[in-house]
From Swiss-Prot:
First-listed, main subcellular location of the protein, grouped into a coarse class: cytoplasm
Gene: proC
EC number: 1.5.1.2
EC class name: oxidoreductase
A GO biological-process term: L-proline biosynthetic process
UniProt family annotation: Belongs to the pyrroline-5-carboxylate reductase family.
Highest classification ranks of the organism: Bacteria, Pseudomonadati, Pseudomonadota, Gammaproteobacteria, Pseudomonadales
Protein name as annotated: Pyrroline-5-carboxylate reductase
Organism per entry: Pseudomonas aeruginosa (strain ATCC 15692 / DSM 22644 / CIP 104116 / JCM 14847 / LMG 12228 / 1C / PRS 101 / PAO1)
GO cellular component: cytoplasm
Pathway: Amino-acid biosynthesis; L-proline biosynthesis; L-proline from L-glutamate 5-semialdehyde: step 1/1
Amino acid sequence: MSTPRIAFIGAGNMAASLIGGLRAQGVPAAQIRASDPGAEQRAKIAGEFAIDVVESNAEAVADADVVVLSVKPQAMKAVCQALAPALKPEQLIVSIAAGIPCASLEAWLGQPRPVVRCMPNTPALLRQGASGLYANAQVSAAQCEQAGQLLSAVGIALWLDDEAQIDAVTAVSGSGPAYFFLLMQAMTDAGEKLGLSRETASRLTLQTALGAAQMALSSEVEPAELRRRVTSPNGTTEAAIKSFQANGFEALVEQALNAASQRSAELAEQLGQ
């Protein structure tokens, strides 16, 4: 497949991450264009990635095959309505804005269009992201491949069968980094109370999190089995696990993810008006 021409509407952090991932994969600078209202941001992105960055959204999409909508959700309706006259029916629209349903994007863009809705997460900034993608009925197989390649430039990209699953993706991976940050904070605090220096407790916690994630990724067994293998009867790990479970750890996680998923659905209803 030939490299598509990609236009980014909005050149903030997530767009910059995607552009950087594409450039690292060898996508020519000439195939990428971006737009942004801020002169300072335009200069920064143009200088960092050697791509054409313009002020006009219409100019950015003029010859694009793929148009990536990377503006804040609150601004999406106005941006789409202003951009609609400049778009061609065959251009693939990829939205990385949280909470905006495909139907709303199509309505704001004026007609049924091929739309892929994505839910990336912040580790994409380090090209370690996890994204869920949903394609509407107008998206072709070739366009699905283009969208998948785009998000794969910053991590893993997994396709969803139902747009409603975006809420679950938001709960698991979209908001997920914050859950791990919270656990890291709690472990560091507890380690300090046990007598470690703040720096030592933090470094041990972060390296343990990284090592555990790498073990889980490289293993062919479920995390539950990995946990069992490192939990000796009557040992220190078992004592900690029993304390977690006695205090309802699994139920607490389920409740938290349900709350995030429900809030995602509520925001989609509000932002999609």
